[in-house]
């Protein structure tokens, strides 16, 4: 096989996904179906194709705040145990169909309480959907392991409660904690209590930082909060200088991020939609990869960005000329950075990822 991977070939490659929002990855048909069942009449279209196009167009807004607006529709149809179970189940199916072998999916339980569900009931429904999806995919010959991150909204005041939820479910499929939402005006340090609670319980967490806001957000996430990973982190490029001769000079923050091997959950297509970068070609992914940061490739929101892991990888291949060895490195980076036990990570790398890439690389 040639060293320039095609999209069809990439679809066969094993993938590891760390940054994907459950409420940003619904099938358009499912949104319509559940909306009809629960009587939600706020959708902009009753045609699946038109609805998918609307989500994509609305999300290509140029700002994170506007990018988040269409989520009101997906969240509206995820307010019952049955709906949460179905969305979780179909998420597993869709990822497995794209050859994802490991995924950490995140969502904010506090957005799903409109019909009186408790946080525990909400998480139970999602985990049950994941488990059933895993069983079905294993039976179909495309095994996948999916784990959950529970997210607190950074503008709200529930982060400690959500962190406690993460610990209650830590042995049932929840592997970590996150904060998300608009960055400007809502720094990570507002949620120190939640992060300290996670550290006190020897638990892992990631923080959305450096997506719409700059270096101060990243600095707080690392220095004050102790983040294990950074959600996006794309603005770390503001602390990197590239000279006329191509020499790369890292600032203090960029250097410690690289040297401590803090993973970056980069989401190229989403970053273009939110205006974090102007285009894939101008995305700092390649600069960060060449500078040996621990970069990972992610979808963020598959419905909103009309994307998949294969498409994200292929866009990088098209833009930066990556080959199979690069894709394998990004995949192993993600698997090394997962919030499951070391032996589980190693097993997936050695017994699934490397053997399947060996066939592709030839």
Swiss-Prot record:
Superkingdom of this protein's organism: Bacteria
Catalyzed chemical reaction(s): adenosine + H2O + H(+) = inosine + NH4(+); 2'-deoxyadenosine + H2O + H(+) = 2'-deoxyinosine + NH4(+)
Binding positions (substrate): 21, 23, 181
Active-site residues, Swiss-Prot/TrEMBL: 211
Entry note: cofactor: Binds 1 zinc ion per subunit.
GO function term, MF aspect, one: 2'-deoxyadenosine deaminase activity
Cofactor(s) in the UniProt record: Zn(2+)
GO biological process, one term: adenosine catabolic process
InterPro entries xrefs: A_deaminase, A_deaminase_dom, Ado/ade_deaminase, Metal_Hydrolase
EC number per UniProt: 3.5.4.4
HAMAP family assigned to the protein according to its UniProt record, in alphabetical order: A_deaminase (MF_00540)
Family: Belongs to the metallo-dependent hydrolases superfamily. Adenosine and AMP deaminases family. Adenosine deaminase subfamily.
Protein name listed in UniProt: Adenosine deaminase
Gene that produces this protein: add
